[in-house]
Amino acid sequence: MIKPLPYKSDPIIVSMDMCDHNKHMNVNYYYKMFDNSYTSMYMDDLDFTPEYIASGFSTFTLEDSIRYLKEFRLGDKVYPSFHLNNVNNKLLHFVGILLNEDGELAAIFETVLGHIDLNARKVTDFSEQRLQNLLSYRTSNKIDEDFPFDLKLKIKDL
């Protein structure tokens, strides 16, 4: 049994439209689940709001990794959770997991986001205040033990 990561999303029940010809959840829905779950954290907890985007800044996904360890089938309950694993001047590294009802690790997601100047369409530094807020969030949601799995993606430390 694995503990969820600090940011927990509401459980999701696998519906018929999420299943494919193999009668299990299609890979598209794993990505969608991860994306929807960490987007809430990104907007609500990390303050990447519509106002921030209107100010000319956002983030773009630079790289993703998904590992599928156990299948989900129709009616199964999925428990998504996330962690802001690392931050530097320009990048964010998130880790997400999907647990099944038995608390077993079913999927691992990692993503690296680059901070973007929407006018130049290029990766740019976070403002000092935003960087400090992100570092503070990461510190207050620190995980004391190592992940029970290897990480595939990495960003440079500050």
Model-derived segments and their meaning:
Residues 2-61, 117-158:
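Hot-dog-fold acyl-thioester-processing enzymes
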Residues 8, 60-62, 78, 92, ...:
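Hydrophobic core residues within well-ordered beta-strands of beta-rich domains
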Residues 16, 96-97, 113:
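Generic short beta-strand
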Residues 34, 96, 109:
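Conserved GNAT-family N-acetyltransferase fold
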Residues 65-101:
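Hydrophobic beta-sheet segments that form the core/acyl-binding groove
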Residues 100, 111-118:
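Long amphipathic alpha-helical scaffold regions
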Residues 103-105:
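Residue-level signal for glycine
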Residues 109-111, 127:
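Short hydrophobic alpha-helix segments
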